[in-house]
A protein has these predicted regions:
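Short, non-ligating residues that shape and space the ligands of small metal-coordination modules
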Residues: 29-30, 61-64
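Short, solvent-exposed loop/turn segments at secondary-structure junctions
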Residues: 3, 30, 40-41
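Catalytic-site neighborhood detector that most strongly recognizes the C-terminal catalytic loop/helix
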Residues: 72-78
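Short intrinsically disordered terminal tails
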Residues: 106-108
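Short beta-strand-alpha-helix junction that forms the catalytic/metal-binding core
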Residues: 20, 42-61
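Histidine-centered catalytic micro-motifs used for acid/base chemistry in nuclease
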Residues: 33-37
Length: 108
């Protein structure tokens, strides 16, 4: 008998190694949440490429912000995301890198 297929939530958590992609914490599974990297209210979809594992704290801090805005001023979380969120769409990763570059580039 084959085991039951994983739910989307279980699949995303497993892909992200049951860790928050933002802070790298590994809380108990009941404290993990799914986060829309690009919020649905801002055009993000329900695809696996737009979903990541987040702890409750990071999900609440990010709220309805797109990941590039949330991560632009937080080098540690940004680095964690780029290392841990291998399943997100490449365009999202590019947007995060571009936003970070704009913050550190001197004016002029």
């Amino acid at each position: 008998m084959n085991p039951a297929p994983l739910t989307r939530r279980e699949r995303i958590f497993a892909r992200d190694h049951n860790r928050c992609v933002y802070c790298n914490a590994a809380p108990p599974a009941h404290e993990l949440t799914l986060d829309h990297v690009e919020p649905r209210v801002k055009g993000g979809d329900q695809s696996d490429g737009n979903l990541v594992t987040a702890c409750k704290t990071c999900n609440e801090l990010k709220a309805g912000s797109p990941a590039w805005a949330f991560l632009a001023g937080d080098a540690e979380r940004r680095e964690n995301f780029l290392l841990n969120a291998s399943g997100v769409w490449p365009r999202i990763r590019r947007a995060i890198l571009e936003a970070a570059e704009k913050r550190v580039r001197p004016a002029g």
